[in-house]
Swiss-Prot record:
<dbReference type="GO" id="GO:0009409">
    <property type="term" value="P:response to cold"/>
</dbReference>
<dbReference type="GO" id="GO:0009667">
    <property type="term" value="P:plastid inner membrane organization"/>
</dbReference>
<dbReference type="GO" id="GO:0009651">
    <property type="term" value="P:response to salt stress"/>
</dbReference>
<protein>
    <recommendedName>
        <fullName>Protein COLD-REGULATED 15A, chloroplastic</fullName>
    </recommendedName>
</protein>
<dbReference type="GO" id="GO:0050821">
    <property type="term" value="P:protein stabilization"/>
</dbReference>
<dbReference type="GO" id="GO:0008289">
    <property type="term" value="F:lipid binding"/>
</dbReference>
<dbReference type="GO" id="GO:0051260">
    <property type="term" value="P:protein homooligomerization"/>
</dbReference>
<dbReference type="GO" id="GO:0010150">
    <property type="term" value="P:leaf senescence"/>
</dbReference>
<dbReference type="GO" id="GO:0009819">
    <property type="term" value="P:drought recovery"/>
</dbReference>
<dbReference type="GO" id="GO:0005829">
    <property type="term" value="C:cytosol"/>
</dbReference>
<keyword id="KW-0809">Transit peptide</keyword>
<dbReference type="GO" id="GO:0005534">
    <property type="term" value="F:galactose binding"/>
</dbReference>
<dbReference type="GO" id="GO:0009416">
    <property type="term" value="P:response to light stimulus"/>
</dbReference>
<keyword id="KW-0934">Plastid</keyword>
<dbReference type="GO" id="GO:0009570">
    <property type="term" value="C:chloroplast stroma"/>
</dbReference>
<dbReference type="GO" id="GO:0010286">
    <property type="term" value="P:heat acclimation"/>
</dbReference>
<dbReference type="GO" id="GO:0009414">
    <property type="term" value="P:response to water deprivation"/>
</dbReference>
Length: 139
């Protein structure tokens, strides 16, 4: 795509034009004191030319850009708020889990201690019984 412009038009245009690549951008060139010439790339390689003013594509583009920016900002804030809620929920559940684990560990320790005492008593009774049998056998 070849274009030729005078030096006055090219001043400030920088790299607004491209060849072959898909880009979504716009560039503005100041032509006169109050006139602004805008080049907006639209779909593949077609370009739209507009003078800045009421009811042209630049105003629509600015409005759409602002709406998109506001939408993204709102959604980002919502996502951050949801992330905070999720973090608070996880912290709450972790503390509940720690409390539950502590209580269950105490119950398990008490159970093991009780069963240990029962086993010791049975062992003592068994030993006493065997000792009594041995004593009787030696008589």
């Amino acid at each position: 795509m070849a274009m030729s412009f005078s030096g006055a038009v090219l001043t400030g245009m920088a790299s607004s034009f491209h060849s072959g690549a898909k880009q979504s951008s716009f560039g503005a060139v100041r032509v006169g004191q109050k006139t602004q010439f805008v080049v907006v790339s639209q779909r593949k390689k077609s370009l739209i030319y507009a003078a800045k003013g009421d009811g042209n594509i630049l105003d629509d583009l600015n409005e759409a850009t602002k709406k998109a920016s506001d939408f993204v900002t709102d959604k980002t804030k919502e996502a951050l708020a949801d992330g905070e809620k999720a973090k608070d929920y996880v912290v709450e559940k972790n503390s509940e889990t720690a409390d539950t684990l502590g209580k269950e560990a105490e119950k398990a320790a008490a159970y093991v201690e009780e069963k240990g005492k029962e086993a010791a008593n049975k062992a003592a009774e068994f030993a006493e019984g065997k000792a009594g049998e041995a004593k009787d056998a030696t008589k």
